[in-house]
Amino acid sequence: MDRKGKGKQVAGSDSYSGGQKRKNSVEFRDEGLRIKKRKNPEVLQFFEESAEVGYYGGSSDEDDDGLGFLNDMEDEPEVEESSKAGKGEKGKSSFVFPKEEDLNEEEFDRIMEERYKPGSGFLRYADDDIKDAIEMDALAPTSKDPPIWKVKCAIGRERRSVFCLMHKFVELRKIGTKLEIISVFSVDHVKGFIFIEADKEHDVLEACKSLVGIYATRMVLLPKAETPNLLTVQKKTKKVSEGTWARVKNGKYKGDLAQIVAVSDTRNKALIKLIPRIDIQALTQKYGGGVTVQKGQTPAPRLISSSELEEFRPLIQVRRDRDTGITFEHLDSLMLKDGYLYKKVSLDSISSWGVIPTKDELLKFTPVDRKETGDVEWISEIYGEERKKKILPTCREGGKGEGSGGGKGEGSGGGKGEGSRGGKGEGSSDFKSESSYELYNLVCFSRKDFGLIVGVDDKGDGYKVLKEGIDGPVVVTVGKKEMQNGPFDSKFTALDLNKKQISVNDVVKISKGPSEGKQGVVRQVYRGIIFLYDESEEENGGYFCCKSQSCEKVKLFTEESNEKTGGFDGTAFEDFVSSPKSPLSPEKEWQPRERYNSSNQGDIGSTYSIGQKLRIRVGPLKGYLCRVIALRYSDVTVKLDSQHKIFTVKSEHLAEVRDRNTVLSTSGDAGTGSFQPFGMLGTESSTGDWAIGAGTSSEGGNWNIGGPSTDSHESLNIERNMVQLCREKNPWGGSKPTSDVSPTVADDNTSAWANAAAENKPASASDQPGGWNPWGKTPASEAGTVSGWGDTSASNVEASSWEKQGASTSNVADLGSWGTHGGSSGGNKQDEDSVWGKLCEASESSQKKEESSWGKKGGSDGESSWGNKDGNSSASKKDGVSWGQQDKGSDESKGGSAWSNQCGDFGSGKKKDGSSGWNKSAEDSNANSKGVPDWGQPNDGSSWGKKGDGAASWGKKDDGGSWGKKDDGNKDDGGSSWGKKDDGQKDDGGSSWEKKFDGGSSWGKKDDGGSSWGKKDDGGSLWGKKDDGGSSWGKEDDGGSLWGKKDDGESSWGKKDDGESSWGKKDDGGSSWGKKDEGGYSEQTFDRGGRGFGGRRGGGRRGGRDQFGRGSSFGNSEDPAPWSKPSGGSSWGKQDGDGGGSSWGKENDAGGGSSWGKQDNGVGSSWGKQNDGSGGGSSWGKQNDAGGGSSWGKQDSGGDGSSWGKQDGGGDSGSAWGKQNNTSGGSSWGKQSDAGGGSSWGKQDGGGGGSSWGKQDGGGGSGSAWGKQNETSNGSSWGKQNDSGGGSSWGKQDGGGGGSSWGKQNDGGGGSSWGKQGDGGSKPWNEHSGGGRGFGERRGGGGFRGGRNQSGRGGRSFDGGRSSSWKTDNQENTWKSDQSGGSDWKKGWGEDSNNSKPSGSSAGGCAGNWPSWDTNSKKETNDKPGDDSKSAWGTSNDQVNTDNNNDSWNKKPNNDVGTSGEADNAWGGKTNAVAPSPSGSAAWGTGDKKTGW
C-alpha cells in the first residue's frame, strides 16, 4: 500500500516533480556528454557518470525491494508526455527511453533519424540558449571574444615562454590560485613575441610576473582585424633563387644592385654580392691614426683592387664561410673577394621582384675574361728566369713559399703566376714583397705589430725590429717565421701635430713624447707611425720612430727639390696655398699650385700621394673627384670613382681637395706651422705664454698669473705672446679696450720691448728670438692712443693696473696702486693684502672711484703715474705725467722722454722730442703745460713718490697717496706718489724720472757713457735681450734671474727664491719690492716704532732697518699707508738682510751684480744692465766699468760712480743703491758693504769708508754723505763719501772732519747734519721737540744705535715741532714743504721745475727747486742759487757756466777736483757750504747753504 501509494504519488500528483527530476537528469546526462558546455565545469565528469549510473541502478531509498526499475518504467509515459510537451514548445526532441510496449519499429526509426539527421540538436541541450554559437564561420572574431595581447619576449624563446606560462598556470591551479588568462600561443613567423588571450592588461602582467625572457611591460593590444591572419598557417615562402638580381632596400647600399649568391630558407637569409662603397682613407685613419672616423658622405661604389688593400694586409683575415664554402678576406667586418663585397642579409631587406639592371650595372658584375693563356706564356718567356732568381733567396732564408705572405696580386695567395697577372707593376711588387728581408725594411709581425728591421738577432734566427711601443720606440726580437712583408712601398702619408701631411723624405721634429726634441728625415710612414732617420743618432743605425701626432713638420721638399726645380723654392707654397680661400678667379686661384707642380717635374711622386683625393681642374671632366693610384714624375694616374674610369693626367691639371674649415697657417717660416694663426680680431689661437693672463677674461691677464707657459720662455714663444699682447691685450696682462681691437699690426711691430711700432724698428724682428715685440708698444693703427709701460691708452677709457685688467670706464673703483691697495682719500687703511703681483681689490674713494696701475693706461685728458691712474682725469687739469705715463702737457720740444718711450724708445737710443712718460708717447703737447713730468709724479707739488704742496714725503701717503698708494683722484694741491697720478692742475709739469735732457742721461735713455734701458748698446744687450756677458730683463742668463721666472741661485722678479729676494719677494737677506714682510702687519702706519722705508718694524737686525735705511719711515706718523702696502709687510722698502744684499728687489751675489731683478755679467747693458763705457754718467741700473757715474741697481766695477741698488765692483767711491759694495769707497743703497769704504744706503757699513744714506759710518775719515763728493776726483756717487771736509753726509756720520751727514751727527767740523743736531748747537733739521722719534717717527727703543732712524738718530724727528718736515730754520726750503708753493724733497727728484717758485718756498738742492731726479732743469728759477745747481739726479746740466756743479747722479762731474766748497755736486747738487749753517741744514749736495741736497 505504501509502495502503491508511493507509486501513485509518483504517477499522479508528483508526476511533475518526478518529470522534472528526470528532465534534469537527462539534461545533466547530456551535459555530461557535452563537457565543454557543462554548466558546472568544476564538477568532474566521472562524478556525473556515477550519478547517472546510480540513477539508473535505483536510488538507495527506493530500491530496497528491487522494484525501483519498475516504478521508473511506470513513470516514463508521464515523463514522455512532458517531454513531448517540451518538444512541442521547443521544437526539439530529447533522448528518452520509451516504454517497450509503446515503442514500435517505425517510431524507433523516426526517433533515430530525427536524432542523427544533419543539423540535429543531438549534441545540444534541450533548453540551450546559445544553440548557434559554434559554427564554422565563428572563427571571425567578435566583440564578445577576449582581446589578444602581443607581448615582447626574447628572440628565439617564443615557444619556451609559452610553455612557461602554461606550466605556471597548472602549478598555480594546484594551490588554488588561478591565472586570469584564457590562452597563450606563439607563431613561428613572428619572432620575439608571444600572444596572450586575457580580458585585462593587469591579468597579463600578473601572469608574466617573475618569468625570465618575457617583457610584459612591452605589451600591445592586437587589433581584431589582425587576428585571422595571425592564426592562419603561413605556408607561403619567398621564392628567391641563386643568381637572380635584387636591390637593397635600406642602409648604405640602398638602391644598389645586388646579385644573390646563396639563399638559406631556414634562416631566411641570403648572401649577396655588391659593389663596395668603402672609403680607404677613412680606414687608413681608423687603423693608422687611432682616431674614430666621423661619418661623412657615402663613398661612391667602386671595385677595390688587391693592391689597395696591401696597407691593411696585416689586418686582413682569410676565412672560409661555413654556409657556402666560399673563402673571403675579412677586413673591418667586411667580406671581400675579387673586389666585390659580400654580405649576408635578410630576405626581407632586399627586393627581388621586377629588378631589371641597367647595362652599366651589369658591366660591373661581368666576370673578368681570363683568356690569358697566351699572355702567361709570353710573360713567362720574358720574366721566367728572373722570377726563379728572385724566388731562390726566399727558400734559403727560411722557406718563404709562394704566396706565403697572403699574396700580392689578384691571386691573393694563389701563387706567383696569378700575382703577376696584374702586369709588370704588380708582379714586381710581388717579387719585392716575397723577397728576403733586408736591413731597414718595414715588416709586419704578429697580428697588428709592425716595425723596422734594425739588426739581426745574435742567434741568427730572427731580426731586431724597431717598433713604437706604449712608452716610446722599443726594439724587439722577431723570428723569421713570424714576419711578413707589408705594403711598404713608401706611399703612405700621415698627419702631424698641425694636421699637415707628412710624407717620405719630409723633415719633422718631435714635439712631445719620450723622444721630444729629436729631428729627422721621414723614411717610412705606416698606420700613423713615422720612422725617422738622423745621421747623428748612434742607436739603431740612426733610426727612431714616433707617432705622427707627436711630430711637427719642419719643411716641405726643400733643397733637394730646389735643385730639381731650377731654384724655385717649394716652401713658398705650403699645403694651404694650393686652395686659396679668397674668391679669386680660377686662373689666379690655382696659379700657385700650377707653378709649384710645373716646377717640380723632376720630383718622382710629385706633391701628391697615392690614395689622395684630387679634383680635375680642366677638360670635360672638370670638377670631378678622383683618387691617385699611380705616380710617375708629373704624370698622375687617377681613378674616377663615379664613372669607374682610369686615366693619366698632368699634375698641373689636378688640385687638392681642401676641407672648408681648414685654417690657413700664418707661420713666418714656411712649413713649420709652429706659429699659430691669429683670429679675425687678432686673438691668437695658441696658448698664451707668460705675461698673458688667463685667456680673455675681463679680469684675467695678471702679469705673472694666468695662462701657463707652453715653453720654458723660449724666445719664439715670448715673441708670439708679445705680438698678441700688443694686439689684443694690455701688454702687462690687462685687456685692451674693446674699441681698440684692431687686426692690423704693422710690419715693424717687431720693435724691442718698449719700442715704438712705427719709427724706431730695432734689430729684433719677429723672427729674431728675444725681441720683445710689443711691450710698451702701440700698434701703428692706433695713432691717437698713447700707451704706458706696455699699455695702450684709449680716449677717456682708462685701463687697469699693471697686471690687472681694468674696466673701460673711469669710474671704476680704484684698483690699488703698484704693490698696494689703494685706500680711501681720508687716509683710512684697507685691511686686504694687495701686492704688486696681485689683482688689486677695488676700494671706494670718497671723491671718485678710480683704478690705478703701474703701467696704467691714461685717458686722452688724464695721465697716470708709474703704476697709477687718476680717475679724475679731465681736460682742465694740466697733464703732468708720472713714470710710465705720457706727458701730454709738455709744450717743450724735448719735453720729457719716456722710460722706454714710444718715439724715443728705450731700446732705440734715439731721443725723440716731445715724447715723455715711461713708455708713453707725447701725443698731444698742450701749451698750457709748462714742464715735463716728474719721475712718477706730475710736476706741481709732487716729488718722487711724493705729493707736493704739503703732501706726503717719499714713501709716505699724505692727503693723496705715496708711491704705490692710492690717490684721491681729485686733488688739486698735491700730486700722487711715484706710481700715482696727480689730478691737480700743475703748471710746472716736471720731466719724467728717466727723462733725457740736454747733455744729461735719462733713466733708460742712452747717455754719453751709458746705454739706454732696453737698448742694445755697443757690446751691450737689449733690455729683454740676452747679452753676451749678461742676461736681459725677463731673460734667463747665467747666474742671473729671469724677470718673473725662477732661476737657480737667483730669484726672479715677483718670484720666491731660496735665500734671495725677488722684486716683490721677501728674502731672508734682501728686500721685496711690493711684498709683504714676515712681520705681517695689517697696517703700516709710520708712527709705529722701527719701521723702515717700506714700513718694516724695528724689531729685526739693525733696529728694523729697512732697505732704505734704519727702522724709520719717510713719512709722518699721521700718514696712513707705507710706500708699499696698506696691509702686510713692506715692499720696495723691505729689509735687506745679511750680506749679499739685494738690488732693487734683486739679490746680487757678487761683483756680477744684477739689474732691476736681473744680473748682468756682460759689458754693456740697458736698464739694469752693465755699462761698458768708462767715463761720463752711468745709466739707471748700469754698471760703470771705469770711474764716473753710478748705475741704479747695477754693479759699478770701478770708478767712483755708485750703482743704485747694485754692487760696486771696484773703485773706492762707487756705491750701489741698495747693493752691497765689496770694495772700499762705494756705498750701496740699503745694502751692507762688506769692504771698508763703501756703505749702502740705509745699510751698515762694515768698513770705514763711504756710508749709506741714513746709516752709521763704521770707519773713519772716509765716510761719505748721500750726495757727497766722492773720494776720487772724477765724480760722486749717490750716498758716497766726500773726501773734502765741510760736506755733509746725508743721514751719515762723517768719521772724518768736515761735512756732516744728513740726519747724522757730524763728528768733524764743517757742515751740519741734515736732520741731525750739529756740534754747533743747532737743532736737527725738522727735529721733534719731544720724544725720540726719527725721521719716520720711529721710536728710540731697540735696534742699532738706539733706534736711530733711517735719516737720523733715535729721538729725532724730521717733522717734529714744525709745520713742515725736513725743513730748515728759515722754513724757506723744505724737503717736504707745507707751503703751497714750496717744493718738497721729491719735488724735482726726477722732476724739472720749469716755473719759478716763490723765493721763500724754494726747496733745497737746486736753489729754488730740487733738480729733477734724472732730468735737467731747463727753466731757471728766480732763486739765486738756481744757476749753480741745475743738474738733476742722473742727468747733465745744460748750463755751460756751471762747470763744477753739473754733476748728477749717474753723471760724471766736469771737474775732477774740488774742495767741499768747490766740490762737484753729489746727488744732484753742488755743496757750497763748508761751515755749519746757522740752522744746521747744510745743503746736501746743493749750492744753497740753507737747503739740504
UniProtKB/Swiss-Prot annotation:
Residues 401-417, 1186-1213, 1235-1264, 1284-1321 have a biased composition (Gly residues). InterPro entries: KOW, KOW_Spt5_1, KOW_Spt5_4, NGN-domain, NGN_dom_sf, NGN_Euk, Rib_uL2_dom2, SPT5. The keyword Hydrolase does not apply. Residues 732-1493 are annotated as: 42 X 9 AA approximate WG/GW-rich tandem repeats. One of its GO terms (biological process) is gene silencing by siRNA-directed DNA methylation. A motif (Nuclear localization signal) lies at residues 21-28. Effector of RNA-directed DNA methylation (RdDM) triggered by small interfering RNAs (siRNAs, 24-nt RNAs). Functions as an adapter protein that binds scaffold transcripts generated by polymerase V and recruits AGO4 and AGO4-bound siRNAs to form an RdDM effector complex. Promotes the expression of 24-nt RNAs. Required for the initial establishment of DNA methylation. Together with AGO4, required for transcriptional gene silencing (TGS) by DNA methylation and repressive histone modifications (H3K9me2) of several chromatin loci. Sequence repeats lie at residues 732-741, 775-784, 789-797, 818-827, 836-845, 854-863, 866-875, 883-892, 917-926, 935-943, 944-953, 954-962, 963-972, 978-987, 1003-1012, 1013-1022, 1023-1032, 1033-1042, 1043-1052, 1053-1062, 1063-1072, 1073-1082, 1132-1141, 1144-1153, 1156-1165, 1167-1176, 1180-1189, 1192-1201, 1204-1213, 1217-1226, 1229-1238, 1241-1250, 1253-1262, 1266-1275, 1278-1287, 1290-1299, 1302-1311, 1314-1323, 1389-1398, 1433-1442, 1467-1475, 1484-1493. Disruption phenotype: Decrease in the accumulation of several 24-nt RNAs. Reduced DNA methylation and released silencing of RNA-directed DNA methylation (RdDM) target loci promoters (e.g. LTI78/RD29A, YKT61/AtGP1 and AtMU1) without abolishing the siRNA triggers. Suppression of gene silencing mediated by ROS1 disruption in the double mutants ros1 rdm3-1, ros1 rdm3-2 and ros1 rdm3-3. Loss in non-CG methylation at DRM2-dependent sites. Reduced H3K9me2 at IGN5 and IGN26 loci. Residues 60-80 have a biased composition (Acidic residues). It is found in: Nucleus; Nucleus, Nucleoplasm. Its main location: nucleus. The lineage of its organism: Eukaryota, Viridiplantae, Streptophyta, Embryophyta, Tracheophyta. This is Protein RNA-directed DNA methylation 3. Residues 790-812, 866-875, 1156-1172, 1218-1231, 1270-1283, 1366-1382, 1392-1401, 1432-1442 have a biased composition (Polar residues). Residues 757-767, 1122-1134 have a biased composition (Low complexity). One of its GO terms (molecular function) is DNA binding. Residues 1-34, 54-96, 393-432, 578-602, 692-711, 728-747, 757-1493 are annotated as: Disordered. Residues 239-266, 501-528, 607-634 form the KOW domain. Interacts with AGO4 via its C-terminal region and with RNA transcripts. Binds chromatin at loci subject to transcriptional silencing downstream of RNA Polymerase V, but independently from the presence of 24-nt siRNA.
